Swiss-Prot record:
UniProt keyword terms in alphabetical order: Cytoplasm, Heme, Iron, Metal-binding, Muscle protein, Oxidoreductase, Oxygen transport, Transport
Family per similarity comment: Belongs to the globin family.
Molecular functions per Gene Ontology: heme binding; metal ion binding; nitrite reductase activity; oxygen binding; oxygen carrier activity; peroxidase activity
Domain called Globin: residue spans: 2-148
Protein name according to UniProt: Myoglobin
Record bears the keyword Iron: yes
GO CC terms, sorted: extracellular exosome; sarcoplasm
Organism the protein comes from: Caretta caretta (Loggerhead sea turtle)
EC number of the protein: 1.7.-.-, 1.11.1.-
Length: 154
């Protein structure tokens, strides 16, 4: 299920467009996640009181968390599936401390693809979208596998 060199080139090519503005991309991803899947917001004590879109948009903590999420994902993507060193601590914290279900990873990965498509329509064609979806599926599967190693069925 690995990606070809061409697919990785598509993934990293679009990621190079995302990286200069991780905070805006990340903020949009987190806000959309909370809008579409309100149960995910309940996992974050610091975001529970942000009950409106305006409150989410004006929250520096939401922007900061979105940046953190996309920064970590970018480091993993750049490893081109040789991401054990980056993935293991992320999986451990999400499995043992935060208890984030794999389903939530699926939600956020779908939203990441949608946000990139909206922000970069001319650079994120069908081949790039397919490659990114495949890379994110690989990420999710590897996270799920690590979760099991840490005793979390998520």
């Amino acid at each position: 299920m690995g990606l070809s060199d061409d697919e990785w080139n598509h993934v990293l090519g679009i990621w190079a467009k995302v990286e200069p503005d991780l905070s805006a991309h990340g903020q949009e991803v987190i806000i959309r996640l909370f809008q579409l899947h309100p149960e995910t917001q309940e996992r974050f004590a610091k975001f529970k009181n942000l009950t409106t879109i305006d409150a989410l948009k004006s929250s520096e903590e939401v922007k900061k968390h979105g940046t953190t999420v996309l920064t970590a994902l970018g480091r993993i993507l750049k490893q081109k599936n040789n991401h054990e060193q980056e993935l293991k601590p992320l999986a451990e914290s999400h499995a043992t401390k935060h208890k984030i279900p794999v389903k939530y990873l699926e939600f956020i990965c779908e939203i990441i693809v949608k946000v990139i498509a909206e922000k970069h329509p001319s650079d994120f064609g069908a081949d790039s979208q397919a490659a990114m979806k495949k890379a994110l599926e690989l990420f999710r599967n590897d996270m799920a596998s690590k979760y099991k190693e840490f005793g979390f069925q998520g």
